[in-house]
């Protein structure tokens, strides 16, 4: 395939690319690390306000990251109205509020699934607090990821833990406003090693179906066993109208939270192909595209710029798949021809097309180069001196 230009895209595909947005995680800008060490970065934000300043920088140079996810209590402030105004003044909306029931001593044996009713009540109360914060900042979604599970057979009743989870989720869901939704994330292991209470998309889906139409599944690309066909899961959840959001990242071994597309760009393309094929890239599709990453070694803002442009490149390639040729090859059972159509799109260099798109939007065609030349990193390194840098509370 020759190098395409923006004009080679059909008007609908061009519009989808122009309106694509990706939500950034506030915690990606703070100091983070592995279970062995949290590494520090000069100029790391010290509070949620400075995190939002950094989010705004990514959006200023990519044009596709106008929202931020908050994590409570990492992003607790005294005045949420002030935080919302601070974000709005920088062109940033608050998209998702993430709960945290995995860093309190009381949650040693679980949170929403804990056998102790008092601890379950505490975990539910935290989610109700998150819903209040959603109202204050105008966030439409509550995202729940649970570390709940067991390490040894016999430690607790698997069935009873599911019953407790269903009851806890029902209480949280009932507290949502009519314009708010709940998205439930799954992870196949870690930190629980015998069984995890929400280990897979089927478990998340079962609970969401029981809750109601405003409960949907979050798919974190790093939360699967090696070799899992993630695009198959994407297709199934889209068929059912229950794919609520992505947490994009990359992994080599487990939940590595590396830059999306770094380990397997072909997988990212295959995922975005299912999104495009199902019409789920449209802004009103109900699918929220988010990043969930920790930049342990690299600079935070450049890492998020690279991540956003990686998703954008995979999307552009998916939009270039020749659907007519693909359908024709499938209709006659021409396996290699169908695969060729697919691979041709993946192997296309879409960087010139995206540079053209950015120029048409008044942006620099090379967002990474432009950001590094802006002097912002040097400025925050000199200005953000004193105080405690934001982190993940580990």
Residue map of PLM features:
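N-terminal small/glycine-rich loop or linker at the start of catalytic domains
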Residues: 20-39, 100-114, 146-152
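Active-site-proximal loop/turn and secondary-structure-junction residues that shape catalytic pockets
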Residues: 28-30, 72-76, 98-103, 146-150, ...
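Catalytic domains of carbohydrate-active enzymes, especially glycoside hydrolases
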Residues: 15-24, 28, 41-74
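Glycine-rich, aromatic-flanked loop segments that form ligand/cofactor-binding clefts
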Residues: 19-29, 72-102, 133
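Short, acidic/polar
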Residues: 41-58, 124-132, 227-236
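Active-site acidic/histidine proton-transfer and metal-coordination neighborhood
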Residues: 6-16, 94, 106-212, 216, ...
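Histidine-acidic metal/acid-base catalytic patches
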Residues: 1-29, 37-40, 56, 154, ...
